[in-house]
Amino acid sequence: MTEPVIKMPKKSVKERQQQVLEVLIGLLNSEEGMQRVTTERLSKAVGVSEGALYRYFPSKTKMFEALIERIEMTLTSYINASKRQENTELAVKAILQTILEFAQKNPGVTRILTGHALMFEDELLKARVAKFFEGLELQFMNLLQMRKLREGRAFADERALAGYLVNFCEGQFLRLVRSNFGFNQHQHFEKQWQLIKPLFY
């Protein structure tokens, strides 16, 4: 299958970097998303030489790092919006739904977060993804700890529950990748939530 070619007009370095990232995520979102994205393949899709790519990013590792940072910022904004629910239980449910819907709609992102898109890349990227999940766990933990102030009730172990919620997300990401995104997470979430809900009582 021929990769789509995008002609790049004269733009600032920052604009070109954003365009490279958009093409990269587009390749990861495609049916060939499980294939390794080489700089040759990426440069063809962008419509520039391999050498030109390195004018925008010093290495492919830096491209993926920028992409992971972008994913992190996007999800953080969604999570912050979900925290506005009236109580902790509803906030956690909204966050889980938001994260899983995002994963379903963005196969390339999910392949990065499960490590499948990074199998042949620098080990530093796997450490960066691990840091992403540590940050997610911290956000859950902070939200759970706020319950005592907001509702006058505390959990027995906020850290353990936060870790469980992150593990749940990771498991669903892997299930999506394993099914090649044929698994409909939205259809099954309410039943799964009924198993998580008792942890809030």
From Swiss-Prot:
The keyword Heme does not apply. GO terms for biological process: cell division; negative regulation of division septum assembly. Gene3D superfamilies: Tetracycline Repressor, domain 2 (1.10.357.10). GO terms for cellular component: bacterial nucleoid; cytoplasm. Residues 38-57 bind DNA. Residues 14-75 form the HTH tetR-type domain. It is found in: Cytoplasm, Nucleoid. Keywords: Cell cycle, Cell division, Cytoplasm, DNA-binding. The keyword Cytoplasm applies. It comes from the Bacteria. Homodimer. Interacts with FtsZ. HAMAP family: NO_factor_SlmA. Required for nucleoid occlusion (NO) phenomenon, which prevents Z-ring formation and cell division over the nucleoid. Acts as a DNA-associated cell division inhibitor that binds simultaneously chromosomal DNA and FtsZ, and disrupts the assembly of FtsZ polymers. SlmA-DNA-binding sequences (SBS) are dispersed on non-Ter regions of the chromosome, preventing FtsZ polymerization at these regions. Belongs to the nucleoid occlusion factor SlmA family. This is Nucleoid occlusion factor SlmA. It comes from Glaesserella parasuis serovar 5 (strain SH0165).
